[in-house]
């Protein structure tokens, strides 16, 4: 059983606990696997040298997961640009940003990365852009033995038929979904959860 780091996002964001205490906390709670959240590491997100910061992230977490005999399972990638954007330059930049985390997941012996598909409201354009980005990232991830999985994360990404068109349209066996069963709200206002926001 693995633990999502997001379960303690308030604790880590408050600064009272380092995100690098995640392995220790999960171990003490009886979990065996770790699901990391990229946005919870300010030493990475605020770094002027992102590749080096991610490399340090990998080194530290590999040491900690080994120390506590934990398995690295997943990295949830946030705030690395819009993979579904119709601005081609922005979309391609986002792809390159995500590749850094896919390589990190490989170096940590994870099985998957989770990404978001934001950047376009028009359904047809969103599907087209999403398919291109998913196909590119899945091709990059395949030889690294990493699965590329998409979370329904509010707004258009929570439209299941459209999301599955994007997933299936990639035609990649290592591309799939990470369902969040509390996140099927399509509202543009608020986070998009059935528990708050406009839903």
Predicted feature descriptions by range:
Residues 23, 33-34, 132-199:
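Acidic/histidine-rich catalytic cores of soluble enzymes
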């Amino acid at each position: 059983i693995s633990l999502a780091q997001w379960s303690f996002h308030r604790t880590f964001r408050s600064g009272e606990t380092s995100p690098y205490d995640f392995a220790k906390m999960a171990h003490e709670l009886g979990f065996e696997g770790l699901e990391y959240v990229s946005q919870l590491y300010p030493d990475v997100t605020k770094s002027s040298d992102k590749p080096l910061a991610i490399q340090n992230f990998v080194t530290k977490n590999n040491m900690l997961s080994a120390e506590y005999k934990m398995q690295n399972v997943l990295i949830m990638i946030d705030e690395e640009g819009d993979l579904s954007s119709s601005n081609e330059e922005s979309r391609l930049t986002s792809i390159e940003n995500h590749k850094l985390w896919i390589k990190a997941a490989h170096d940590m012996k994870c099985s998957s990365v989770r990404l978001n598909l934001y950047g376009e409201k028009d359904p047809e354009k969103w599907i087209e852009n999403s398919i291109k980005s998913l196909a590119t990232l899945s091709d990059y991830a395949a030889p690294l033995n990493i699965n590329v999985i998409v979370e329904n994360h509010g707004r258009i990404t929570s439209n299941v038929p459209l999301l599955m068109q994007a997933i299936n349209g990639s035609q990649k066996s290592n591309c799939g979904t990470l369902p969040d069963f509390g996140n099927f709200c399509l509202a543009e206002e608020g986070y998009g959860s059935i528990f708050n926001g406009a839903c």
